[in-house]
């Protein structure tokens, strides 16, 4: 009679392999494919039995976390209309082509503290000076940790007015959506004179309510703020209120040098 214990190592290994395969299947079923692949790869590596519990968890969870974070970032970029935009603020600095005021704006804005604190940013400069580039770069950085959205101001107002006329309940729902965003970017702000009272009301409502909720809004304009009131006809009160909220906290001026 030979003790059955001599076969235990092999049987234990088979049981462990079976259990690992079950865990891999369960992870795949939970749509945790990176964790499943990591666990399977680690188990078949020579160092598997030498890993302590914490190291094992780090190596199994790490790739899944990075994958999920990357997917969330890409999804946020698409929803924000920022996919394919500039992903770095490195080019937003004084050069032979353009200058920025204040000079320390990059250090101030790159932290994105203005979003967390609900402060508005106004980016001013002539056409093709780099306003959109800076705003989009900030928006893309924001998508790592915040919900953002980029719009051309005129298109935004036209769409919102049309929705308000067609279905007021859907309009209200859309307004609530914009109020929940951590960052709203309105490019080409007041590029042309607004004569439609409905557009003025929409712009005022969004700016006013976001300000009340301490939600950050970035506006980009090639016009000096002191001329904005003349761009919003027949409603001086709303014009002044919009001006006050858009320029209340932080202003960046881009000046071409050529």
Region annotations inferred by a language model:
Residues 139-151:
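Post-Walker A helix-loop "phosphate-sensing" segment adjacent to the P-loop in P-loop NTPases
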Residues 100-106, 149-179:
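Short glycine-rich substrate-engagement loop in P-loop NTPases that contacts/grips substrate
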Residues 118-134:
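Walker A/P-loop nucleotide-binding motif
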Residues 146-147, 180-183, 211-219:
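Loop/turn-to-beta-strand initiation segments
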Residues 110-118:
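Phosphate-binding P-loop
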Residues 87-110:
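N-terminal pre-Walker A segment at the start of P-loop NTPase domains
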Residues 32-84:
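Interdomain "pre-motor" coupling segment immediately N-terminal to P-loop NTPase/helicase cores
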């Amino acid at each position: 009679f030979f003790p059955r214990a001599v076969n235990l190592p092999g049987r234990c290994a088979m049981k462990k392999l079976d259990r690992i395969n079950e865990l891999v299947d369960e992870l795949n079923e939970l749509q945790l494919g990176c964790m499943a692949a990591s666990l399977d790869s680690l188990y078949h590596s020579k160092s598997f039995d030498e890993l302590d519990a914490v190291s094992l968890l780090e190596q199994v969870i790490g790739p899944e976390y990075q994958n999920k974070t990357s997917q969330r970032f890409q999804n946020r970029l698409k929803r924000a209309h920022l996919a394919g935009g500039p992903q770095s603020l490195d080019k937003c600095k004084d050069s032979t082509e353009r200058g920025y005021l204040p000079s320390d704006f990059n250090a101030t804005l790159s932290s994105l503290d203005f979003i967390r604190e609900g402060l508005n940013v106004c980016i001013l400069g002539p056409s093709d000076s780099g306003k959109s580039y800076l705003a989009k770069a900030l928006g893309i950085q924001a998508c790592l940790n915040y919900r953002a959205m980029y719009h051309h101001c005129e298109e935004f107002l036209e769409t919102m007015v049309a929705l308000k006329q067609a279905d007021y309940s859907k309009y209200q729902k859309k307004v609530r959506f914009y109020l929940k965003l951590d960052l709203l970017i309105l490019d080409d702000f007041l590029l042309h004179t607004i004569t439609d009272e409905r557009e003025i009301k929409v712009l005022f409502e969004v700016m006013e309510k976001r300000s009340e909720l301490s939600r950050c809004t970035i506006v980009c304009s090639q016009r000096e703020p002191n001329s904005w009131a003349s761009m919003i006809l027949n409603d001086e009160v709303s014009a002044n209120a919009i001006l006050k909220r858009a320029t209340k906290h932080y202003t960046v001026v881009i000046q071409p040098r050529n």
